[in-house]
């Protein structure tokens, strides 16, 4: 959000003490994210992301995995800026899971009768590996394999589908948080996720 930079400029020029808080979810520093995958010249994106980091007084990340990914992408080789690593670390806050409110939000979808549905709840992107999901479909005809984004679902329709499914599936190569497995577990749908990325902290 470019407003953050404008706010920081004005505060410093007016010598006003403010605190800016930023929540990080993804960026070009992650080579598996579509920003890291599709943007070829990352000199401008990584410099902007570093600038945003230092504009924030507090930078919030849900997992240690994301923190390590962020530091490696923006402050590791070839960026020779280890001289202010202490300043980097003091600006980082690991929050843990930030979405406890979902339990109450999804209350009405709990204890729904289960159908033989396995759900793919992610965006259709290479880093989400939907082809693995389709391969499983060919070998497990007793289940209905549904890719949520292939249907025009309202939020209520999606949550009903999540509540009816027996399993929510991920073979992701990119995940810094992972909301869909958590939503699934709240409505008694079993999460099937890999032991990597943020999943190793959040699920396993």
Where do the protein language model's features map onto the residues?
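Active-site proximal beta-strand in glycosyltransferases
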Residues: 11-41
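Short hydrophobic beta-strand element within catalytic cores of glycosyltransferases
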Residues: 190-193
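Short alpha-helical donor nucleotide-sugar binding micro-motif in glycosyltransferases
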Residues: 159-165
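Membrane-proximal helix-turn-helix segments that form the acceptor-binding/catalytic region
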Residues: 38-59
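Donor nucleotide-sugar binding/catalytic pocket of nucleotide-sugar-dependent glycosyltransferases
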Residues: 54-107
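Aromatic "clamp/platform" in nucleotide-sugar-dependent glycosyltransferases that forms part
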Residues: 172-173
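Conserved donor-binding/catalytic core segment of Leloir-type glycosyltransferases
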Residues: 99-128, 134-138, 145
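Short alpha-helical segment that forms part of, or immediately flanks, the ligand-binding pocket
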Residues: 159, 181-186, 197-201
